[in-house]
Amino acid sequence: MGRAIGAIEGLPVLDLGRRVADELGTSPDLALVAVPEADYRRVEARVACQVLDHAVAQGAVVALGSGCLGDPRIGLRLEELRLVHDRSYQIVALACATRVLATRNGLDAPRSVALGTVHHQFVQMLHERQARCQDLADVVIDTTSTTPDEAGKKVM
C-alpha cells in the first residue's frame, strides 16, 4: 500500500522491513529469523527513527510495520511528528480479518494440530499490535478484501 500512495503522491517509499534487512545483511523474508529477535528489534527501532527523520526532512511515505511499535519510543516519535507538524503527516493503520492474515502468513493448513499453538500466538500478537496501531492512527483501512492499490486510494 505504501508504494501505491508513493506513486499517487510522487514520493519515495521508505520500507522499514527492507532497510532493517539491508542493515542486517539479509533479505526481508529472512531478517527476523537471521538474528535473535532482540537484536532485530534493536536495529528496527534505530532504523525506524532514521526513516522517520528522513521522511520529515525530505518527504516520503514510510511503511513501518506493526512490530516496531513494541518499542514505545516509536509511538512517542510518531506522536511528536504529529504535534510538531500540525497533522501534516497522516498515520494509517491497516486492519485485516484474522483468517485472511493467517492465510497471507502461511498459517492456514487445514486442520493442522501442529499449527494450533502457533496460530493461537499469532492471533494474540495480532490483537496486541492492532490495538497499538489503532491508538496511533489517524485512519484505519481494512485490507481484508482490497489490493494494495485499492487500499492506497482509500487513504488518498
Regions found by a protein language model. Name each.
Residues 4, 8, 90, 130-156:
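NTP-dependent small-molecule kinase module
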Residues 7-16:
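Post-Walker A helix-loop "phosphate-sensing" segment adjacent to the P-loop in P-loop NTPases
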Residues 83-132:
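A glycine- and Lys/Arg-enriched "phosphate-lid" helix/loop adjacent to the NTP-binding pocket
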Residues 4-5, 28-30, 75-79, 106-110, ...:
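Short, glycine/charged-enriched secondary-structure capping and boundary segments
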Residues 13, 60, 89-92:
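Hydrophobic beta-strand scaffold residues
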Residues 18-80:
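ATP-dependent small-molecule kinase phosphotransfer cores
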Residues 39-46, 124, 128-135:
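A non-catalytic, amphipathic alpha-helix used as a structural packing/dimerization or gating element
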